[in-house]
Amino acid sequence: MDLLGILSPNAYFCSMAKLINLKIFTHFFRSSAAGGILLLICVLVSLIVANTGLGVHFNDFLGYPLGFEAAGLQLRYPILLWINDGLMAVFFLLVGLEIKREVIEGELSSLRHAALPVLAAVGGVIIPALIYFLFNGQSPDTAKGWGIPMATDIAFALGILSLLGDKVPSGLKIFLAALAIVDDLIAILVIAVFYSSELHFLYLGYAGGIFVLLMVFNRLGVKNLFFYLLPGAVMWYFIHHSGIHATIAGVLTALTLPTNQEDKDSPLEKLEHALARPVNFIIMPVFALANTNIAFESEMLQGLTGNLGLGIILGLVLGKPIGIFVMSWLSVKIRAADLPAQTTWTHVLGLGLLGGIGFTMSIFIALLSFQEQAYQNEAKFAILTASVLAGAAGFILLSSYNKNKQEQ
C-alpha cells in the first residue's frame, strides 16, 4: 500500500469530501422532513415528464403488464395497478400497525388522550365532505368524489411542521401525528364501505377465512412474521378479486399482529420499524411519481372554478382547518380534552391548515372515485393546488405567529 498516496492532500480531501457527503446524506434521510421533500421532488419530476415528449412513453411504461397467469391464477397486471393496489397495500399495512400501536399504548390508548385527535379528525372529515357535497351533490358524475377532501398526507404535513423546528411546541407534532392516524382510519373505513365495486362473496369468504387463521396465530402466540405476511399476501389476492379495494388487506393483516406494552421487540414493533423507511422513501415517492403525471391544458385552470375543483379546493383549504379547529375548540370547551402543553389556538388553526394537504391520499381516493381520465386529471390538479395553498398558509401562519411572540 502506498502510504504517501494515502497521506497526500488530494487523497485526504477526497476522503473527507466522501465522508461529509455521506454524513449529509445520512442526516437528510434521518430528518422528519425528508419524506415530504422526496415526495415533492417526485411530484416535480412527474409533472415535468408528463409535460414533455417523455409523457407518452411513461404512460406506456405504467401500462405494461407484469406477472403471470397459471392454472386459473391471475397475477398479471399493469405496473400502475401493482403500484396503486400492491405497493399501497404495504403502505396501509404500516398505517394499520401505527393505528394498533397508538390504540394499545400511544396517544389513542386512553379516552382523555384520544378525545382531542379523534374529535378533531372527525371534524376535519365531515366539514370538507359537506363542502364538497354542497358543490357536487346534484351531479351524478362527480358526487362520488366526496371522500377526496377528507384525506391528509401525513408525510407532507409533518414534513412542513418539522421545517419549523422548535418554533412550534412538540405537543403540536404529536397532536398532528395522532390526528393523521385517526384520519387514515376513517379513510380506510370510507374506502372499504363506499369505494368497493360489485362484491364477490366467494372471494370474500376465502379472505375472511385467512383473517380468522391470522387471528388464531395471534391467540396461539405465534411471533414469526412469515406466518402473518404470507397468508396476508394471499388475502390480498382474494380481496383484490372480491370487489373491495385490495389495500384493505394490509390493514386487516396489521390488526392481527401480536404486540404488548412490555415487549418492545414484538412482531408489530419489528415490522413497523422495518417498513417505515421503505414506505416513506420508496413506496410513497413511487406512488407520487406514477400518479401525479398531469399533462397541463388550458382547460384545467377553468376547471378550478368548476364544481369539482371548487369542492376539492374549498374542502381542503377551508373545510379541513374549520373542522379541525371547531371540533378541537368544542372538545376543550366541554372539558372532554385538553390542548397539548404550550399549544395555543393559533397553533391549532395552523395545524388545521396543514391537515388540508391532501396530496397522495386525496389522489388515491380520486382514482377510486373516477374512472374517467378527464375527471381524474381535474381532481389531481385541484388537489395539487389546494395542497400548495393549505401548506403555504399553514407554514406562514405558524412561522409568523412564532416570530410575533418572540418580538413581544
Swiss-Prot record:
MF-aspect GO terms: sodium:proton antiporter activity
GO biological process terms, semicolon-separated: regulation of pH
Membrane-spanning residues: 36-56, 79-99, 115-135, 145-165, 174-194, 197-217, 225-245, 281-301, 310-330, 348-368, 381-401
Location within or outside the cell: Cell inner membrane
Topology of the protein relative to the lipid bilayer: Multi-pass membrane protein
Catalytic activity field: Na(+)(in) + 2 H(+)(out) = Na(+)(out) + 2 H(+)(in)
Keywords carried by this UniProt record: Antiport, Cell inner membrane, Cell membrane, Ion transport, Membrane, Sodium, Sodium transport, Transmembrane, Transmembrane helix, Transport
Homology family: Belongs to the NhaA Na(+)/H(+) (TC 2.A.33) antiporter family.
Name of protein: Na(+)/H(+) antiporter NhaA 2
Source organism (scientific name): Flavobacterium johnsoniae (strain ATCC 17061 / DSM 2064 / JCM 8514 / BCRC 14874 / CCUG 350202 / NBRC 14942 / NCIMB 11054 / UW101) (Cytophaga johnsonae)
Lineage, top ranks: Bacteria, Pseudomonadati, Bacteroidota, Flavobacteriia, Flavobacteriales
Gene coding for it: nhaA2
